[in-house]
Amino acid sequence: MPDIVIETERLILRKIEESDAALQYELLNTPAVMECLGGVKELHEIEAKHAKSMSWFAREGFGFMMLIEKSTGELVGHCGMKRVDNPLAPNVGDHEIGWLVREDRWRRGYANESMCAVIDWAFDSIGVPYLVAITSERNEASWRFMEKLGMERRKDLDFDDPAYDPRDNPAIQYSLSREQWETEKCSGPA
């Protein structure tokens, strides 16, 4: 069993391992899930992202993790924290959080449950001073969720990314400080 990093009431968040790419390709790489994330990816692209995440954990002690549903043992998504590594972003090196939930598990509170745990982990265990999250204005569900987490819109961090559909530009960012989180903390699945 890969290393468990975080455990919540319904989820296990564990480190990504090489064999996870095929599972993510099959279950998370759908047109609906990937619509505002640059579209469906090739398996080699997912493998490259997984390799990056494994190296982040080895080098910095954090990265993205697979979300495993305790009741079924099934993959329901992935989430975590990484460094902003898009060279077009004005804040390269900041700590960025992100999430992805399988389409048939939407609206069950898994994003909220996992990200509340990830944010606690980032501030309390890793010791980051603040977090950012990146999305597009078109991805209203994503930025509304960022607001629900207590994050604030940061127009000064917007940037254009030609790798994405023009409808998904500019990339927009939200941020959350440790102090904000202390007053905004999640209360559980919603």
Features from the language model and the residues they span:
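Conserved GNAT-fold acetyl-CoA-binding loop/helix
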Residues: A32-K52, G63-M65
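Short loop/turn motifs at secondary-structure junctions and domain boundaries
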Residues: W56-E60
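Short coil/turn segments at beta-strand junctions that form active-site/ligand-binding loops
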Residues: G61-G63, P129
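Acyl-donor (CoA/ACP) binding surface of acyl/acetyltransferases
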Residues: M1-C36, I68-A190
